[in-house]
């Protein structure tokens, strides 16, 4: 899947990803009114408004961009209807040949991590058949629990030819409370970056690994260091724009 992402970027000449992080009060009033007229001011109505809003964004941009990144929490807050809207969004984006990176930030161990990985990137066994759950192409992963939390995702990625983006240095202001702490004279984010590079060596595409990294645009100097540590790692760079990251950096 990393090869498809790179191919899409080259085809569109746009190394960007469109975030589909809908907030109900930001959705245009006419979309909300139509959804509420059909489903009422209910979770189902909110989910319909979100789905229609997302569809409009995708229809307006799909031929200009390589990928989208829906943030699952924005859908989960609306319960099962919200998750249904998330799934519809994923499926619709894939029908437009967009690469879909599920911003799920999962982090657990053992069978729980494996279940997350299967649910978002793989196929679950049901009797004699297998079914895809959410079926994203990539997923974001929190490495705080170590290899026990990441390896199950890697196993599914290897089987499905999909990928992950591991949180290394995030864009939020308080990220340094843990990520910048030094261990034997080196910041934690550098050590995580080294581990991501090692994991990536096990899952290589054409030049880049299926194991990517999340490195915030709000910390460009740290990003330069991490690029040297992770030369074969595709980097997802949040924080551009509203959070203060600039293209020149």
Question: How would you label these PLM feature ranges?
Answer:
Residues 58-65, 90-95, 154-159, 227-230:
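Acidic (Asp/Glu)-rich catalytic clusters
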